[in-house]
């Protein structure tokens, strides 16, 4: 039996629940992916909406997996947490692909991983995100961005659109459309079609 590719979901307290639960719904339906939940030290992590997830220490993760990081109010202290940033930088840098949702891109930017790359983020937090990553080519109008192995989405629900786009890139458009239909989701297939564009 062929080994599944690990999807390493990195969590921290006060992450935004839909940032992760939406993309997980998509990724778990893709053939050959296995979902794993991690944090710096392991244990129970609580989302901003008080959902609890039992995580393992990130140090047990497959470095070559797919690294996924959400946003949410927990990213505000996270960008100043040197221990967490060191771990995030290592695993995101070594990953085969790196996906961030909402203000998760601010954390990647703080690690220097998005320097010189195109990226986007939650439009309501855009000023703060820009201040974190001044060397990033931030796109104010984008549902999601792809630059090399890095995928970054706009706020919250945009993570589902981005993840379906990621699936289309990996497995073909038909696979992504089928998953969207399976979850009864109206997919915005155009990464530049951003109804929440920052004016």
Model regions and ranges:
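A structured phosphate/pyrophosphate-recognition subdomain
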Residues: 158
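Anionic-ligand binding patches
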Residues: 119
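Glycine/charged-rich beta-loop-alpha catalytic/anionic-binding loops adjacent to active sites
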Residues: 141-149
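A short glycine-threonine-serine/GTX helix/turn-capping micro-motif
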Residues: 149-155
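NAD(P)-dependent dehydrogenases' Rossmann-like dinucleotide-binding region
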Residues: 124
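Extended, subdomain-level signal for the structured scaffold at the beginning of enzyme domains
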Residues: 1-98, 105-110, 116, 127-132, ...
């Amino acid at each position: 039996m062929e080994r599944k590719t690990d999807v390493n979901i990195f969590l921290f307290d006060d992450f935004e629940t839909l940032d992760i639960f939406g993309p997980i719904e998509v990724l778990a339906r893709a053939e050959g992916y296995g979902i794993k939940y991690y944090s710096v030290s392991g244990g129970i992590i609580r989302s901003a909406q008080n959902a609890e997830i039992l995580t393992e220490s990130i140090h047990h993760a497959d470095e070559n997996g797919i690294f996924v990081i959400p946003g949410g109010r927990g990213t505000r202290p996270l960008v100043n947490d040197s221990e967490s940033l060191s771990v995030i930088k290592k695993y995101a840098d070594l990953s085969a692909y790196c996906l961030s949702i909402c203000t998760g891109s601010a954390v990647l930017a703080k690690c220097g991983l998005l320097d010189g790359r195109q990226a986007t983020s939650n439009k309501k937090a855009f000023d703060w995100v820009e201040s974190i990553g001044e060397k990033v080519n931030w796109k104010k109008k984008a549902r999601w961005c792809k630059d090399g192995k890095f995928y970054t989405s706009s706020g919250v629900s945009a993570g589902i659109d981005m993840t379906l786009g990621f699936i289309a890139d990996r497995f073909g458009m038909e696979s992504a459309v089928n998953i969207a239909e399976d979850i009864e989701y109206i997919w915005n297939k155009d990464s530049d079609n951003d109804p929440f564009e920052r004016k």
